[in-house]
Amino acid sequence: MNNTRVPLIFLGTNTNIHWLVDIAVRIGYDVAGIIDDDYHEQKQFQNIPIIATQNDLIANREYYSRYQFFCATNWQPDNTLVSGHTRNRQKYYKLINILQSQQFNIATIVSPSAEVSTYQVHIGHGSFIDSFCVISPMDKIGNYTNIYSHVNIGENSIVGNHCVLQRHTQLAGGVSLGDRVYMGFYSLVSRHDTHIADDTFVHPSMTVMRDTAPGEVISLAGRDLRKIYNRVVEQ
């Protein structure tokens, strides 16, 4: 899963970048720095060097082919009330497109403090498995998916590409998540064999006990994150 023989560059960044760096270094990665045009003029981000521009990657592809990359820009579901959400989402896919179009080596980061079964588990490239997560036997994790601390995924579950499972998300066994699913903090899919469709947004602390439709928002308050949570959605 973790290929530490090739030096690592973070493409894009976020306010929690040092946690990614800490885990990468603990695993044994040699972190060369960050490439992020938003911060290139500053020459660093939170004391981590900004080493090039995104155009440099394309113009000097042969040089950068000796590195591997991890996209560190986060995305959130689109929210017209928070302009930064839409921009981060657009930036995220732009950076992923650079990595794919230039066929760069893609890193996967799995914390040594995560509990990952050795039995028929697949974790896709570009994904992040945080500390104290449980990945159970026969689980399949897609590409570019971020699974944050204390997430517990039951056996024989599938998580698609470009998903975000925020802290303390819980999935029962046999659950399947499509692509670009966003599970909020403390959200729960408690019924076995439930399917969470592409682009579903499950708000924090919501419990889901049925299949969802593509693009569905699971909340009693639409997209207003200020409203009350901790309710069960069953019908």
Task: Give the positions of each predicted feature.
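Short glycine-rich, flexible loops that bind phosphorylated cofactors or substrates
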Residues: 59, 77-79, 136, 172, ...
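A solvent-exposed beta-alpha-beta segment
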Residues: 2-75
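Short glycine-/acidic-enriched loop or helix-start segments at secondary-structure transitions
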Residues: 19-21, 80-82, 212
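Short, flexible hinge/linker loops that cap or flank conserved catalytic cores
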Residues: 1-2, 121
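Extended, small-residue-rich solenoid/repeat segments and analogous flexible loops
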Residues: 63-140, 144-146, 152, 157
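Glycine-rich hexapeptide-repeat left-handed beta-helix
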Residues: 166-235
